[in-house]
Swiss-Prot record:
Record InterPro entries: NADH_UbQ_OxRdtase_NDUFB4_su
Positions carrying Phosphoserine: S26
Subunit structure, interactors included: Complex I is composed of 45 different subunits.
One GO cellular component term noted in the UniProt record for this chain: nucleoplasm
Keyword Transmembrane: yes
Primary residence: mitochondrion
Similarity-based family: Belongs to the complex I NDUFB4 subunit family.
Annotated coiled-coil segments of the chain: none
PANTHER family, sorted: NADH DEHYDROGENASE [UBIQUINONE] 1 BETA SUBCOMPLEX SUBUNIT 4, NADH-UBIQUINONE OXIDOREDUCTASE B15 SUBUNIT
Originating organism: Homo sapiens (Human)
Protein name in the entry: NADH dehydrogenase [ubiquinone] 1 beta subcomplex subunit 4
Gene: NDUFB4
Amino acid sequence: MSFPKYKPSSLRTLPETLDPAEYNISPETRRAQAERLAIRAQLKREYLLQYNDPNRRGLIENPALLRWAYARTINVYPNFRPTPKNSLMGALCGFGPLIFIYYIIKTERDRKEKLIQEGKLDRTFHLSY
């Protein structure tokens, strides 16, 4: 039984298991991968020791999660790229509600003023004539 030759899709990159570069790597690259794996395993072990400590007090601080949250929330402007869509959404969200509320108040006052001038509105508690 023969299998058809794998044809890579134009929409997706080649899987690592089918990439020839995965198996033909230099010793330096292998050493760097092993060092990264060792660091990752050490950090995971430290985290699990803190997580499963029965005498734990307070929260466990994950430095990677703190860096991610800082970059995501507090440090927005160095990573922000202004586009026409961002500008339009900012203008709509900033000035849109103000213009909408102004329009509602203005039309309501104009309608009331017109009714007062025609004498159709009963003003029982008016302060001025």
